[in-house]
Regions:
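Nucleotide and nucleotide-moiety/phosphate-recognizing core
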Residues: 1-120, 129-145, 151-156, 171-209
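Short glycine-enriched, charge-decorated loop/helix-capping segments at active-site entrances
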Residues: 116-122, 161-165
Length: 209
């Protein structure tokens, strides 16, 4: 028996930290992917709502009224570890369930530059995900995981994820953020399961599994 298809995505939230000092750091992979997704969708207006920057896009959906489904793009402005607050408030205000939420975040346990999709699951030590799970009371949301690799040598994790990227690192990071945005767009139009199988199967990215 085939697994049930998750509900269609109505919100894509990218995790990161607000402020220019964090803009070019690994921890802001989610923000960068959301910015790229917004650029591809020609978003020109963001509003401040429930402690987050929020934009709205329409995606093709034959099952929706008028053939379009509204999707919210969200960048919480409460810093990474407390992102669950704004996200849960926006979900409640818009009657969006955990299954209709897609979160884009950095992932230490995946090689730098890799992009993978996961449906549900735990937080794996990621404090941003930890509070989202706590606030929603559910682990059923989908995730796009942007690999950043592990810290070199004895470098602390906090220093690694908040360190400004060097030129070559930034190029790889930007490419991964672009592919994460493409993965999100695919999930919006074709469904999370299709996008997961396509992306994780090596059809997108650098071929690492």
């Amino acid at each position: 028996m085939a697994a049930a298809q998750p509900k269609k995505i109505r919100m894509v939230a990218g995790l990161g930290n607000p402020g220019d000092e964090y803009a070019r750091t690994r921890h802001n992979a989610g923000f960068c992917a959301i910015d790229e997704l917004a650029r591809q969708a020609n978003v020109t207006y963001w509003k401040n709502q429930s402690g987050a920057e929020v934009a709205s896009i329409n995606v093709n959906d034959p099952d929706a009224e008028g053939g379009k489904r509204e999707v919210l793009l969200v960048k919480p402005q409460s810093y990474m570890n407390t992102s669950g607050g704004p996200i849960s408030k926006l979900c409640a205000a818009n009657r969006i369930s955990a299954e209709e939420l897609l979160v884009i975040h950095d992932e230490l346990d995946i090689p730098a530059g890799d992009v993978r999709i996961k449906v549900g699951g735990g937080h794996a030590g990621h404090n941003g995900l930890r509070l989202i799970i706590d606030k929603l009371g559910s682990r059923d949301f989908s995730r796009i995981r942007v690999g950043i690799g592990e810290p070199p040598g004895r470098m602390q994790v906090a220093d690694f994820v908040l360190k400004q990227l060097r030129a070559k690192e930034a190029e790889e990071f930007d490419d991964a953020a672009f592919r994460a945005a493409e993965a999100a767009a695919l999930a919006l139009t074709r469904g999370v399961i299709f996008a997961r199988d396509h992306v994780n199967g090596g059809a997108s990215g650098n071929g690492k599994h």
